[in-house]
Amino acid sequence: MEQEICVIGFSGGQDSTTLAVWAKKRFKKVCLVGFDYAQKHSVELECAQKIASLLQLPYEIISLDFLENITRSALFKNSNDLMGYSHAQNKDLPNSFVPNRNAIFITLLHSYAQKIGASNIALGVSQADFSGYPDCKEDFIKSIEHALNLGSNTAIKILTPLMFLNKAQEFQMAKDLGVLDLVIKETHTCYQGERKILHAYGYGCDECPACQLRKKGYEEFQANKK
């Protein structure tokens, strides 16, 4: 176990929950930080709080509700955009993309890490099995790590252990870590905030892009077990 502090960008979803357990086994102290940016699936914040309690890890929420005033995304509560279409500002991206969201998140996590003396930040981003978001790719993460460290005269590492894992491999990772049941029953992925229907892969509407990706990953995970 490293005698260091690690800050986790924590949403209460499959990726960040698996990541939190991974980090808990490797660092002396792990701090979870979530963001309230007026997302439709704000129920994830409630799930995040519960998961943090179950994992016995400190959890803080940073309010970023101003985001919906300066950019556009189908993820915002007040958006009338329907999921599954191109972004109004960039046709090459899905309309669930929030421009510069991860850049803002990472910048704030970097500041928080400096405040508490953490030398590591861990993110649950992946470019192997993602929703078409360019700010989840390795080249972006490496670039912003370099820029933020230059701008603050620090050497904080941004760790992305899920970067090249698909959802099926993440389910396997959760199983190996002993938290598969927790990931299925307690984490939240659905963009619509559906928490009434429990599928084999977890709660969700079974229709939005996030649910479809998670469902596909779970089915592949199950198939690989046979």
From Swiss-Prot:
Q: Which SUPFAM superfamilies match?
A: Adenine nucleotide alpha hydrolases-like
Give the domain of life: Bacteria
The answer on whether this UniProt entry bears the keyword Cell division reads: no
Stated EC number for the protein is 6.3.4.20
Which of UniProt's keywords are assigned here? ATP-binding, Ligase, Metal-binding, Nucleotide-binding, Queuosine biosynthesis, Zinc
Q: What is this protein's function per UniProt?
A: Catalyzes the ATP-dependent conversion of 7-carboxy-7-deazaguanine (CDG) to 7-cyano-7-deazaguanine (preQ(0)).
The name on file for this protein is: 7-cyano-7-deazaguanine synthase
Which organism's genome codes for this protein?
Helicobacter pylori (strain G27)
